[in-house]
Amino acid sequence: MEILIAEHAGFCFGVKRAIEIAYEELNKQKDTRLYTLGEIIHNPQVVKDLEEKGVRVIEEEELEKLLKGDRLIIRSHGISKKLYEFLEQKGVEIIDVTCPFVKKVQNIVEEYYKKGYDIVIVGDKNHPEVIGVNGWCEDKAYIVNSVEEAENLPFFEKACAVSQTTLIEKHWEDILEVLKSKAKELVYFNTICNATQKRQEAADALSKKVDVMFVIGGKHSSNTQKLRKICEKNCKNTYHIERADEITFEMLKGHDIIGITAGASTPDYVIEEVIEKIKSLKGEDENE
């Protein structure tokens, strides 16, 4: 049996930074309440650990409950400008761990919106990152996530297009081709983060060589879902799992080359647990 781990699997820079800062804030032992706006990352184990240590999750519709001096961690997905201003007015201590790649998209959108450009965001309209980015152009962006949606856009005098940072490269390129015919002047920025791109490329390459492919990450994680889609094209035995205990003997039976990749919100220890589980089950297989 051979277990192969894709390069660039697991925590990305932005997520790692967010987690480190959350634990640093916990260790400060301040007399103020500590919250994260939504789950800090799409990983149930990490969220549970933080909650057990005293970090509360608060949703946007509950923010009125916050008191002056409360600490609020803005997760790596970022938030809208309006929400930022609201929190400042309330006297909340904002701990902003917005991923620098996402911050870059926000800055581009704000700059070009002020210059009078229509903004087009290529991505999932329900994803927190996209919702936050849209908030830097007064929620007036056109959001498209397919070639068909792009074809239905109006014709723009001048437009600026950006991508959700976790998009699949080909998806962005296909939609961009349509956008080029939709504006007299189109300024566009491929804002897919290079860590996402490298992770996807590595998963694509590895899934072509293996009998079974495990994609580890939260079931609601956008970047993990995209990894699963990429791997499924190359390996029919692709499984999206959150935890090692989801792996069964049947998944591995008769297969010798096992591949593993992991989403940006997956800690190293979860990857290690998956490796140990595979070794344990394959040991049983060999003993039969």
Swiss-Prot record:
Matches recorded under HAMAP family: IspH
Protein name: 4-hydroxy-3-methylbut-2-enyl diphosphate reductase
InterPro entries in the record: LytB/IspH
Residues that, per the record, bind (2E)-4-hydroxy-3-methylbut-2-enyl diphosphate: H42, H77, H127, T165, S221, S222, N223, S265
Chain sites annotated for binding [4Fe-4S] cluster: C12, C99, C193
Family listed: Belongs to the IspH family.
Gene3D superfamilies in UniProt: 3.40.50.11270, 4-hydroxy-3-methylbut-2-enyl diphosphate reductase, catalytic domain
Pfam family, one: LYTB
Function field: Catalyzes the conversion of 1-hydroxy-2-methyl-2-(E)-butenyl 4-diphosphate (HMBPP) into a mixture of isopentenyl diphosphate (IPP) and dimethylallyl diphosphate (DMAPP). Acts in the terminal step of the DOXP/MEP pathway for isoprenoid precursor biosynthesis.
Organism: Caldanaerobacter subterraneus subsp. tengcongensis (strain DSM 15242 / JCM 11007 / NBRC 100824 / MB4)
Record EC number: 1.17.7.4
Cofactor requirements of the protein: [4Fe-4S] cluster
PANTHER family: 4-HYDROXY-3-METHYLBUT-2-ENYL DIPHOSPHATE REDUCTASE
A molecular-function term among this protein's GO annotations: metal ion binding
Catalytic activity: isopentenyl diphosphate + 2 oxidized [2Fe-2S]-[ferredoxin] + H2O = (2E)-4-hydroxy-3-methylbut-2-enyl diphosphate + 2 reduced [2Fe-2S]-[ferredoxin] + 2 H(+); dimethylallyl diphosphate + 2 oxidized [2Fe-2S]-[ferredoxin] + H2O = (2E)-4-hydroxy-3-methylbut-2-enyl diphosphate + 2 reduced [2Fe-2S]-[ferredoxin] + 2 H(+)
Binding positions for dimethylallyl diphosphate per the UniProt entry: H42, H77, H127, S221, S222, N223, S265
Keyword Protease: no
Coiled coil location: none
Organism lineage: Bacteria, Bacillati, Bacillota, Clostridia, Thermoanaerobacterales
Biological pathway: Isoprenoid biosynthesis; dimethylallyl diphosphate biosynthesis; dimethylallyl diphosphate from (2E)-4-hydroxy-3-methylbutenyl diphosphate: step 1/1; Isoprenoid biosynthesis; isopentenyl diphosphate biosynthesis via DXP pathway; isopentenyl diphosphate from 1-deoxy-D-xylulose 5-phosphate: step 6/6
